[in-house]
Amino acid sequence: MANIEKKNNSELQEKLITVNRVSKTVKGGRIFSFTALTVVGNGEGRVGFGYGKAREVPAAIQKAMEKARRNMVTIPLVNKTLQHSLKGSHTGSNIFMKPASDGTGIIAGGAMRAVLEVAGIHNVLAKTYGSTNPINVVRATMNGLTNMKSPEMIAAKRNKLIEDILG
């Protein structure tokens, strides 16, 4: 698993999660191409992922980075951790994440760790169940993070005060 990190001029953190060689069988033999899975984030709650395919590795990575920048979403964080425990799933991958106290760090494995790092989440406990395919894990993580709601969002939806929501 390749894990390359880079910061560009607009302060976006870019991480390459995986590069994979795939083949298409035709009458004359095999045609090889490459796929790349990347995540991009600003370290303050904005994160996106991209999946690019091309005949050459650099082109696949570039396509994936562009898609990741286009598909960024904002995640409501509190004290560099999650608002509440959450679950996410995509096909065979299921993930569970819960907020952790200051100084815990990111306790997560593989592709999920890269997503959490570029999103700016510093304290979290996370576990992957089922398939550990990086593409499915990243999609499950993004599904979970986008479904996270802040107390302000819940209060606005219910037409109540934030104090009523927090108890």
UniProtKB/Swiss-Prot annotation:
UniProt KW Endoplasmic reticulum keyword: no
PANTHER family the record matches: MITOCHONDRIAL RIBOSOMAL PROTEIN S5
UniProt-recorded Gene Ontology molecular function terms: rRNA binding; structural constituent of ribosome
Keywords tagged on the record: Ribonucleoprotein, Ribosomal protein, RNA-binding, rRNA-binding
Name of the protein described by the UniProt record: Small ribosomal subunit protein uS5
Pfam families from the UniProt entry: Ribosomal_S5, Ribosomal_S5_C
Domain notes: The N-terminal domain interacts with the head of the 30S subunit; the C-terminal domain interacts with the body and contacts protein S4. The interaction surface between S4 and S5 is involved in control of translational fidelity.
Subunit composition and interactions: Part of the 30S ribosomal subunit. Contacts proteins S4 and S8.
Domain S5 DRBM: 12-75
Cross-referenced NCBIfam families: rpsE_bact
Organism the protein comes from: Buchnera aphidicola subsp. Schizaphis graminum (strain Sg)
Domain of life, per lineage: Bacteria
Keyword 4Fe-4S: no
GO process annotations (BP): translation
Coiled-coil ranges from the UniProt annotation: none
Similarity remark: Belongs to the universal ribosomal protein uS5 family.
SUPFAM superfamilies: dsRNA-binding domain-like, Ribosomal protein S5 domain 2-like
GO cellular component, one term: small ribosomal subunit
Task of the protein: With S4 and S12 plays an important role in translational accuracy.
